[in-house]
Amino acid sequence: NSIIRQPVITNKYVDPLLSQNGDVLYDFTGGNAIIDDYSNIAFDTSLEWRPSDDTNYQVSAGMTNGSGLFFQDLGIGYADGSTYWGQVQATMGNWYAQAFIDHNDGGKSDNPTFLYGSGFRQVAERTTIEAQIQYNFDMPWLFDSEWTVGYDYRDTDSNSDYTLWGRNEDTDDYVTNGFYGQGTLNMSDKVDLVVAGRYDQASFISAGEFAPRAALIYKASDKTTWRLAYNKALSGPSALQMYIDFP
């Protein structure tokens, strides 16, 4: 489409007929509809404090502003907007923790995000919060093993003003969290056994899932290592796959 419009929402859904007369945001008539001139700027800063050899604190923040094309199943689109983020990290002995927040305004009416195929603006505002805590420890009595255990959490709050999630807008929770652990056991001078597991729970799926992993490593020489491994990987649907409700 050579004309990009503000969609008209009816009953929490983009009305494809009324939207044909929505407010005009871009008009590429007579020119190149695919924008080929765009720019990006970024700024970030970080403050680090090390009160001791095994203690470290870090605070970081930044922002980016820019635009560009994107390609997906729905076709070619143009994204514009600003992202603001902040992160705190702490390492204290065997403990590590971090928290992160990221907010993207999804583009405003004067610099919209849109799909060329539909010709409609899409609001893609989102806020993501992440947190993680991790602990490392040794078990000398169990094959001189080294272990890592942890927990992480992620919550993505989206707002599309009904232009993308439509009738799912008010029930689009997307929260994931999981526990994980990994250990390396020194079975002999040449053989290590690595065992790991992760349990994940998602707000959009009723049951959690466990993913195990194991590897037997044989160090035949300084230049040769053999590995026999088993791994089960999990991948959930994206928020777009779960909640899209768009004509």
How does the language model describe each region?
Residues 50-56, 60-62, 82-206, 219:
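Face-selective signature of the C-terminal outer-membrane beta-barrel domain
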Residues 15-16, 191, 224, 234:
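N-terminal targeting/docking segments
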Residues 101-114, 203, 223-247:
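Surface-exposed extracellular loop regions of Gram-negative outer-membrane beta-barrel proteins
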Residues 204-226:
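Repeat-solenoid scaffold signature
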Residues 42-44, 180, 213:
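One-face residue pattern on beta-strands with alternating periodicity enriched for small/polar residues
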Residues 1-79:
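Periplasmic-side early beta-strands and strand-to-turn transitions of outer-membrane beta-barrels
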Residues 81, 207-209, 232:
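Active-site-proximal structural scaffolding
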Residues 2-33, 111-121, 163-170, 240-247:
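Solvent-exposed loop segments that connect transmembrane elements
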